[in-house]
């Protein structure tokens, strides 16, 4: 997605060897116009897939997931990283390791929001090692629902997340694919769209 790649080049900041900071438009402050375009692109791509729910993980996946769900006219569910007292029955959980935060969290979704009839599109902000998507897949499958595809805003193609998911049989669509960081600049790999 050319618009997204341009924004990454303009406002993204490389930290170390493998971190891209995009807090000015995705991971802290949200550019709703860009997120709306991202949502439209995902919705157009998956319009024929019969999607009934969009699922993401808090927090930075919420914005692109909301706009995707809006464009598809289906509910969006986000997995919570912390249990609260209102989530006390029928909770579906999985362990998820965060590459950026270097911690493992138990993420959860109330089972009442997913059913075996659901066809789910997972949307997330980044794909690195695939652990967030893998955890969401586990939760979705605990409910008996089907993962139709995984939509990623920014993929770190130099990490093994995509291979892990595709080898497990899940289609992955990434709007921006980072090939590498070179001389303080992002070098893109050809995106899926």
Swiss-Prot record:
GO terms for biological process: purine ribonucleoside salvage; xanthine metabolic process; XMP salvage. Keywords: Cytoplasm, Glycosyltransferase, Purine salvage, Transferase. Pathway: Purine metabolism; XMP biosynthesis via salvage pathway; XMP from xanthine: step 1/1. One of its GO terms (molecular function) is xanthine phosphoribosyltransferase activity. Its EC number is 2.4.2.22. It comes from the Bacteria. InterPro entries: PRibTrfase_dom, PRTase-like, Pur/Pyrimidine_PRTase, Xanthine_PRibTrfase. It catalyses: XMP + diphosphate = xanthine + 5-phospho-alpha-D-ribose 1-diphosphate. Xanthine binds at residues 20, 27, 156. GO terms for cellular component: cytoplasm. It holds the Pfam family Pribosyltran. 5-phospho-alpha-D-ribose 1-diphosphate binds at residues 128-132. It is found in: Cytoplasm. Belongs to the purine/pyrimidine phosphoribosyltransferase family. Xpt subfamily. Converts the preformed base xanthine, a product of nucleic acid breakdown, to xanthosine 5'-monophosphate (XMP), so it can be reused for RNA or DNA synthesis. Homodimer. This is Xanthine phosphoribosyltransferase.
